[in-house]
């Protein structure tokens, strides 16, 4: 009999409601190396003290409920409960604070992002005592990290498979995203790959619709890959979207891709779900396929500053669940992404050990204990004039993906691909020569235009295009 059970047996069960903070607010608690640590941005209802709100978050996301229950006496709450161990005010906000919560590792199933999120970002987000709640960051202990396979292959293995080193990889999303027949779709893939891109991509919306069934798309894209490889002497790939309505159908598509001999498949990991994603990731490792991840639906979860979950948490979850690439914003394009915040979660995707750095939104030091890294993909509203900034911001271990910035070229898809490849090679060469891409970027692109008419035409088309709106998500 546990001490807690013994005590309750002596004094009798006392029904009723008591303040959460009496049990779940423990400012003297010393966190353990095995604890999962969470940083929540909490906005309580008027009149709810910070300690009570923070304790409520810890309780409702672990062992607690709204009233005392007699079965508390059948276990050891001290062993299993979440604890709010620190509260810190948010600068510039009157009624908002960061609540730090520690969760014992035994609360979570091994190797399951699904189970971890069911607790930590579950019903507590609808709790009436809170006006808003946002999960800003998680510290995943190395004891839990080691229960996950992680990315199917990782950055170095991908480079070795592709035999491409010393520069970012280049991609393109085929447009229009919906409506093309499989044969015309395959033609666009071929033209882009022949022009110098490393990858082309299914849009996240492309699954298996009446205008283009998945099997037809896979066949025509495989033909485009092999033909462009034969012409260029480079290894090419197309992200074949295996996302489907069931896990069984998803795996059937991945199996067909492997039988075609293509190097990479794709999954929409948030709409598809973490269970499906982890299943596909395991299949890809076992069968030599790279896995590209799209984050469709992320902004529903992460864009509001006061409620939801920050993308850095979704990025960590993806690294655990498995994926070799993931879309991570561009900083300079059409999609949301403040520079320091973006670089923060890019570090969390790629690096093995990341120190706490609040200037980048990183609340905890994270040790991935050699879990393979994920390549960030910059995609969304980018074109050749952005190439110097993208090369400088993201570095070599990245994919720079131009959809409209390739297919919108006035001379066609292949010249659009040529323009992007020339711009990239010019930026990499200039960087390697010691030139400052941030300061000299436009001059570097203009110099390259002199010996690439394709690049010159692209620069003329997009010279006025800018997406200058303030980021919603700031530190």
Swiss-Prot record:
It catalyses: 2 (2R)-3-phosphoglycerate + 2 H(+) = D-ribulose 1,5-bisphosphate + CO2 + H2O; D-ribulose 1,5-bisphosphate + O2 = 2-phosphoglycolate + (2R)-3-phosphoglycerate + 2 H(+). The keyword Cell membrane does not apply. Binds 1 Mg(2+) ion per subunit. Pfam families: RuBisCO_large (PF00016), RuBisCO_large_N (PF02788). GO terms for cellular component: chloroplast. The modification N-acetylproline is found at residue 3. The keyword Plastid applies. It is found in: Plastid, Chloroplast. The modification N6,N6,N6-trimethyllysine is found at residue 14. Keywords: Acetylation, Calvin cycle, Carbon dioxide fixation, Chloroplast, Disulfide bond, Lyase, Magnesium, Metal-binding, Methylation, Monooxygenase, Oxidoreductase, Photorespiration, Photosynthesis, Plastid. Its cofactor is Mg(2+). The modification N6-carboxylysine is found at residue 201. It is an enzyme of class 4 (lyase). Heterohexadecamer of 8 large chains and 8 small chains. Heterohexadecamer; disulfide-linked. The disulfide link is formed within the large subunit homodimers. Belongs to the RuBisCO large chain family. Type I subfamily. This is Ribulose bisphosphate carboxylase large chain. The gene is rbcL.
């Amino acid at each position: 009999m546990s001490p807690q059970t013994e005590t309750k047996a002596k004094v009798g069960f006392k029904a009723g409601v008591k303040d959460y903070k009496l049990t779940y607010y423990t400012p003297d608690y010393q966190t353990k190396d095995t604890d999962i640590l969470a940083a929540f941005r909490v906005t309580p209802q008027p009149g709810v003290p910070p300690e009570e709100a923070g304790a409520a978050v810890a309780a409702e996301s672990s062992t607690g409920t709204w009233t005392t229950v007699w079965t508390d006496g059948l276990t050891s709450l001290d062993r299993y409960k979440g604890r709010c161990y620190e509260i810190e005010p948010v600068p510039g906000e009157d009624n908002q604070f960061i609540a730090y919560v520690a969760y014992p590792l035994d609360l979570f199933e091994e190797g399951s992002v699904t189970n971890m999120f069911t607790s930590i970002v579950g019903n507590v987000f609808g709790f009436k005592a809170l006006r808003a709640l946002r999960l800003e960051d998680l510290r995943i202990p190395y004891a839990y990290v080691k229960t996950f396979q992680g990315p199917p292959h990782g950055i170095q293995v991908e480079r070795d498979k592709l035999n491409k080193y010393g520069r970012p990889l280049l991609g393109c999303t085929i447009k229009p995203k919906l409506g093309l027949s499989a044969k015309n779709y395959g033609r666009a893939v071929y033209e882009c790959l022949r022009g110098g891109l490393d990858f082309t991509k299914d849009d996240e919306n492309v699954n298996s619709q009446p205008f283009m069934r998945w099997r037809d798309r896979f066949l025509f894209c495989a033909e485009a890959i092999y033909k462009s490889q034969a012409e260029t002497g480079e290894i090419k790939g197309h992200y074949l979207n295996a996302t489907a309505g069931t896990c069984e159908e998803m795996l059937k598509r991945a199996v067909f891709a492997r039988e075609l001999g293509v190097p990479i498949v794709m999954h929409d990991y948030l709409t598809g779900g973490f269970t499906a994603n982890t299943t596909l990731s395991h299949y890809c490792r076992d069968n030599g396929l790279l896995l590209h991840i799209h984050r469709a639906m992320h902004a529903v979860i992460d864009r509001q500053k006061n409620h939801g979950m920050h993308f850095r948490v979704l990025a960590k979850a993806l690294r655990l669940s498995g994926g070799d690439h993931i879309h991570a914003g561009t900083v300079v394009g059409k999609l949301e992404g403040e520079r320091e915040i973006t670089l923060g979660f890019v570090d969390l995707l790629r690096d093995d050990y990341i120190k706490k750095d609040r200037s980048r939104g990183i609340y905890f030091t994270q040790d991935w204990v050699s879990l393979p890294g994920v390549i960030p993909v910059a995609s969304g509203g980018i074109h050749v004039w952005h190439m110097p900034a993208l090369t400088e911001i993201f570095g070599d271990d990245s994919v720079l993906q131009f959809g409209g910035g390739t297919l919108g070229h006035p001379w066609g898809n292949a010249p659009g691909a040529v323009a992007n490849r020339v711009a990239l090679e010019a930026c990499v060469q200039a960087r390697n020569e010691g030139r400052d891409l941030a300061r000299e970027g436009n001059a570097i692109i203009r110099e390259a235009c002199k010996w690439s008419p394709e690049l010159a035409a692209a620069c003329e088309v997009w010279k006025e295009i800018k997406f200058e709106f303030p980021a919603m998500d700031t530190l």
